[in-house]
Amino acid sequence: MSATSPQSWMLPAVVEFSPLSGVDLPLSLRTLLRRRGFGEKAAEEIMTPPPLPDPSHHFPDLAAAVARVCQACERGDALAVCGDYDADGMTSTALLVRALLPLGALAEPAIPSRMDEGYGLNVAMVERLHAQGIRLLITVDNGVAATEALERAQSLAMDVIVTDHHTIPAIRPPMTALLHPATTPTDSPYRGLAGVGLAYVLAMSVAERLQQPKAIQVARDLFCIGTVADMAPLTGANRRWLLEGLTTLHRSHCEGLLALQRLAGIGDSPLSAEDIGFQLAPRINAVGRLGDPVLVVELLTETDRGKAMALARRCDDLNRQRRDLCDAIEAEAVALVEADGEGQVPPFLLLAQSHWHHGVIGIVAARLMERYHRPVALLAGDGDGRLRASARSPQGFAVDEALTSCADLLDRFGGHPAAGGFTVAAEHVHALHERLNGLAEPWLLQQGCNRPIRPEVCLGLKEINWDLWKGLNALAPFGMGNRSPLFWSRGCVVEDWRVLNGGHLALTVGQDDTQRRAIAWRTAPLEPMPPSVDIAYELAVNEWRGERRLQLMLKAVRAHQPEVTLTCGERRYQARILPIKDAGIEPITFEVINSTGESLRASLDQQAPVHCSDERSEHPQVRALLEEASIALGLRP
């Protein structure tokens, strides 16, 4: 995040004066929900999710999958849980292994190496597992597109249950059963499940059929970790199960999770989704990026506290290596960009170095995307004159479609609008970059090079209190599908600022008699620092030496301007708050001026809508302009 990079602030939408009045939340949060399209029923359900329907009514193949797994449990058959090397795949694997062993199945993990075998189920794995006497495979977070491997399993008379949330191919490969969100009804609460959610559905259903609920006492905990780590949408079943699981995760019966929490310095109180996303998930993901993913499965299935701590320390060491690698590659990448001079960043930033590590270039690509606000691809050497890449893209530019347009230049590719990956021969890199630049340039010209800032609700600093925090927690957990609110405050006096170790910017800002502390990670100060600023931020709690304090996590800072510019079509207007002595009346009065100097005055207070006695304000467009002005001037949430 670069809070001081060139910015384009977007005005929040106008909503009714007192939205969702039947919802027990502060006005600012009710306004937030209304802007996100919530009605009163949906707003209540986000705070208290409704009971979930029987998953067997939503997954067509669930009954067949449960019957086959129960058969394996009752006969004591060997089976393999075939995962992948990200946090979703590793937690899914551990979840099923840990659940099925006490139910009687001889479950063992089978995860390919990122560096040696690539992603997902493959023919060599199938043949190796068959030679070991295994006749049932359960894939987690992969498998739906592994056509060759599934056909080989069929030829060997192996049963395969596929649990996956990636795109189902047009011609479905042979499999015994498929658990996939896309096979559920379009309005199903199970539609957003990641791989670990599907594994949880299967484990829960098998344990219920065999009447052994204790077998899955850790499954909910692993579901929480994998769901947040995979950035699955925190809606529907994900939201309900996560809300239930977070309350007890710090007291998990999984020794591996407890060890990770101790190393991260958390776990004395209930965890948040942020604790998972920023503390636990990186330590798990680092193993898949740099080491052997079986380490995570061993950690999450270990029952001895001492052994679990030793395994957790190995994960922690790999995470430190991951951080160092990311910082080094980022510094090298920035130096390569800046060597071409300021203003020379191409529309699609593509950088290649053979020594970069495949496992972390995606993280660095995301950082560079934030820094330069354009699509980014980083390429690392893959042997035999080829390079392997990770790509990231800002909202609005679909990197998967861009890669499809370059298919003739690529060995293989895949992804979704925000992220992708590909392999390319070295001799095609220049042509690939030229084509990607051509695709990105029109989007960048339309979008602009400035980083868009989209604050959702304006707060006065005095509104930032523990009552607001309580209401905010009622809307948590935040993540994909339920993003953390971006607040903004206007006209904050900079009372103090300093740069902390690590290049972080710390501010103390004030309004009237209220002060708040703010911090922006990895951000340089404005030069010069203006006396008054507008700030966009998320709210957090900083705990230090037993003291809890609300803190603003800055996402953007700009110099405050008393007047704001509004646009309506091709027309531009200026708006400003009038001093009370000039207005002659209370409450607050503001003025909107058009390009010819004509003005329109309106007034408002916190208890009533915008009031204007001028008959021109009866026109819908003029009324909308006054409402927008009240928001832009920070007079309305």
What would you call each of these model-derived segments?
Residues 150, 187-190, 267-268, 366-367, ...:
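A generic local secondary-structure boundary/capping motif
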Residues 31, 106, 239-334, 370, ...:
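Acidic, two-metal ion nucleic-acid-processing modules in DNA metabolism proteins
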Residues 1-31, 35-53, 57-60, 556-577, ...:
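Terminal, basic amphipathic appendages of nucleotide-handling enzymes
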Residues 165-166, 357, 416, 504:
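Histidine-centered active-site/metal-ligand motif
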Residues 106-108, 159, 177, 517:
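Conserved beta-strand segments of alpha/beta enzyme cores
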Residues 85, 142-143, 165, 354:
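Active-site metal-binding loops of divalent metal-dependent hydrolases
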Residues 12-136, 156-157, 207-429, 441, ...:
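Hydrophobic helix-and-loop "lid/oligomerization" segment in the mid-to-C-terminal part
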Residues 129-132, 139, 145-232, 403:
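Conserved phosphate-handling catalytic cores of large alpha/beta enzymes
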